[in-house]
Amino acid sequence: MKKLAILGVTVYSFAQLANAATLNVKSYGTTQNGQKVDLYTMSNNNGVSVSFISFGGVITQILTPDAQGKQNNIVLGFDDLKGYEVTDTKEGIHFGGLIGRYANRIGNAKFSLDGKTYNLEKNNGPNSLHSGNPGFDKRVWQVKPLVSKGETVKASLKLTSPNGDQGFPGKLDVEVIYSLSDQNEFKIEYKAKTDQPTVVNLTNHSYFNLSGAGNNPYGVLDHVVQLNAGRILVTDQNSLPTGEIASVAGTPFDFRMPKAIVKDIRANNQQLAYGYGYDQTWVINQKSQGKLNLAAIVVDPKSKRTMQVLTTEPSVQMYTADHLLGNIVGANGVLYRQADALALETQHFPDSPNQPTFPSTRLNPNQTYNSVTVFKFGVQK
């Protein structure tokens, strides 16, 4: 791996590839408390690139070619650091960020572990959502370029969350590895270790629009989605799981066969009404636990772009961004509205610490938290 400095931009060249891939690094500004933030861009040899910043590990841009070879940015975001640090925090939208310590909701913002109750921030009605503020997506991570045989480019992001942070027990050392391959696979690997028993549930909160943000008047409503899931978690009016797991058969949540989002998103259904659209947890049909399983396939009929999502996690939260109310101006001056994007958050079940029948999210000192999610990009033939 060679390191070059060109016009203030650091370029890491990975020479083992026939057409050397690069990881470009440049300054992205400083936070309000004076921390330096850098922008990293990983590129492969097929015209796909992924950009992220050390602030929150936020994915700021994913460029992929459409069926005609035209590149567009397929994730929502902002033009500058202030957008992610100030506007995003105020609105609670988490564009592109790494979510932790516990993604999604924990009921009544508290849980018990080994007989002790831990209280969290109530930031979503009576519940805790994404562990309150500042979450992992509002902190500066330590980033280090890596290289591995067979992968175009790779970077490690590290963060230490001290004991008691966000109300959770134990010091948590987290490493997230972003990598982009010449198979157009953007992989996110999560690892975490603790010094005392705790609970962990990490994810990434990117908002996708395969047409490119602002390029489709229908947002993602015409996107065709297929989910490898036959069940959902039933929620209450605050989008908190009740503990019931229900079949999707005969409901608007049945995406076992490819279906346009628009077909059922406004159906007369109480669960849809609670989320103002799709904001539910689907239970993935796992062939084997701990291995990559297909979670979702998304196709944009306009650009012919496709995205497959594979994960080791037991569930995926599909969120159609129906809380974007047209009051947020994003990158390139685009006004973000309801259903302008689709989030596919791979994760453990929400509120697992309070739901004994759900898979456990407990992490002990002698264990390592491991999770992998892959976003594979392509075009429809």
Swiss-Prot record:
UniProt KW keywords: Carbohydrate metabolism, Isomerase, Periplasm, Signal
Subcellular location: Periplasm
Catalytic activity line of the entry: alpha-D-glucose = beta-D-glucose
GO molecular function, one term: carbohydrate binding
Highest taxon above the source species: Bacteria
Region forming the signal peptide: 1-20
A Gene Ontology cellular-component term: cytoplasm
Main subcellular location of this protein, as a coarse class: periplasm
Summary of the function given for this chain in its UniProt record: Mutarotase converts alpha-aldose to the beta-anomer. Active on D-glucose.
Record family assignment: Belongs to the aldose epimerase family.
The protein, known as: Aldose 1-epimerase
Organism: Acinetobacter calcoaceticus
Gene name tied to this protein: mro
